[in-house]
């Protein structure tokens, strides 16, 4: 049956039904079903989050100063982002300001996470959708060295011997029959287009990125004490500054500042000399693969982040842009007010929650987390062994957030789409430079590859910002400012009887918001609306589909039984299902079984 959605997509649930469950190389648990016609083109898509989030329920009645420590445990991949958003929400509610040094340190920690997350995503979660490590065994190491020197002449690891050593390591993997992290790939699928030398170069950088990621996160251990889940503080940051101290536990001294500086330099070198060149090199072989646009050229949302000055979240003060684009009008960027109940609402008509009446949308301050697991009449299978979900009923543990009634895509591509705003010429120049280097039109941005490219551009931009705030912190310290926390309102006796606030960040995956209500010194209500809630949204009461589902439509599959193309597009969002949902079914049993590896 063919239907037209209000947000402009044609769905046809006839044809062959393909089930990908679980979707791997993501954080959390996700299921995807698509219908494919006789030409191998996807005509319908259904995205299901298969875990239930209960942390909002856990937070009720707790001390708001502790909320960051709970919300941070939502996810270990985007570690720290939920904590930062949480302390901002509580500070917003209680009118707490933070010192300039705390703002710089928070920004550096968030920027460090952006860089780390984007590198891990590109090489370890997404690259294998485009790169064939088995094909790398056919490469000529000398030709690979020449390719590396042409793509990135500044990267020092480029000799034929270096690539030959990596190739020999790969050969041992393959000959042993134990492919490990390369197991279960569709390596003979014609969707893979790279020549062997490009495959060897990219696989080598995959291994280099593994080594880099353990160094990058040391910034979090320096300022936050550990990683994952560094420590945070309502009112600032928990690390005192003692530049003359040597080895002082927990204090920031010159030794630690020098280490931070060296990590920033290493991140910058890798991003500029490996990550961005690899993106261009790999993308150059897939320039015609412009599927996966979905909502990206139509409706996008960015909260913005990285305030230049503490306590000022006005759009003009944010280094990462804020704004919303709807109806495909890239020339009009709407401002975003997350406190406005007319702007942000969540719907649950197709989610396993209950709001009491159909079609009701709730602003997060009034949001509810009341599970209601029920399956539709057209389900194929059983409650614990679902063959095909019924998308006409409830089918996901993810809610359906909407901005002024519109399904929105969030993430680095959404932020990139907002650069028509005055004050972000540096981002605009990045985008124009990439398109010029790859000889692509602006329309190419609104695709799976464009989404992936936006992450790389954001990583490079964040490297520059991290250096900016490091220099700002050092200058403040030299001028005698060592303040890192404001504890004037730490005591609950200074708080109002009732208060509410909102915290926002631009997480690596996109717009993240926490809304809190405080009463008598305790959390009365707490709601998180996370990037994958926006992107992984099921249908709403009007039939609008979310970003995941929209992005898969009209994609041509080489072999429907080997869903390389589905994984490419879903991975381009870097889904984090643990952030958007938590815990399995009430019985603790898996809801589905694997249909396609």
UniProtKB/Swiss-Prot annotation:
Domain of life: Bacteria
EC class (word): oxidoreductase
EC number(s) from the headed UniProt entry: 1.12.99.6
Topological relation to the membrane, as annotated: Peripheral membrane protein
Subcellular location: Cell membrane
Cofactor note: Binds 1 nickel ion per subunit.
Principal location: membrane
Binding positions (Ni(2+)): 75, 78, 576, 579
Reactions catalysed: H2 + A = AH2
Cofactor(s) required, per the database record: Ni(2+)
Alphabetically ordered keywords of this record: Cell membrane, Membrane, Metal-binding, Nickel, Oxidoreductase
Gene Ontology CC terms: plasma membrane
GO MF term (any one): nickel cation binding
Family, as annotated: Belongs to the [NiFe]/[NiFeSe] hydrogenase large subunit family.
Annotated function: This enzyme recycles the H(2) produced by nitrogenase to increase the production of ATP and to protect nitrogenase against inhibition or damage by O(2) under carbon- or phosphate-limited conditions.
Name of this protein: Uptake hydrogenase large subunit
Organism: Rhodobacter capsulatus (Rhodopseudomonas capsulata)
